[in-house]
Amino acid sequence: MDNSFQLDQVIENQTFSGNMLAKEYEACEFNYCNFEGIDLVSIQFINCSFMGCNLTNCKVKNTAFKEVSFTDCKILGVNFSVCNPFLLELVFTRCTLDLCSFYKLKLKGIVINNCSLKNVDFVEANLQDAVFENCDFYGSAFERTNLERADLTTSRNFSLDPELNIIKK
């Protein structure tokens, strides 16, 4: 694959390894691709979608996710707290995000629908105006987390200490 820039591509049923990835993807669709354990360091994804992909244990240091959606993806153990925070915009639908970290990330207005978020680190994250629809937060950590106007009404298994978090309607 070209190692520089991919625009408006549909990439399907690909198993990635080593240096197979371009440095930047814009308006690309990844369908049923396997990125398990892949180093995505410093890659830019702009206005991209991932459908049915496996991103378990990917390394995302300085990776840019700008207007990126994930649907029906398996994303276990990914440390999103080290990705590039500039213009970070993520949407997750029907994904498994267990054991991920969003530590200290600014995710104002993030939308997460019908996802498993077990044992996820949200410590010191800014989740103002976030929408968590029908999500399972079993064992997830919220401490010094900004949850102003966040909607968790249809979600379950979360424990929020109002003394340790910012919670306002």
Functional labels for PLM-detected ranges:
Residues 1-169:
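Tandem repeat scaffolds
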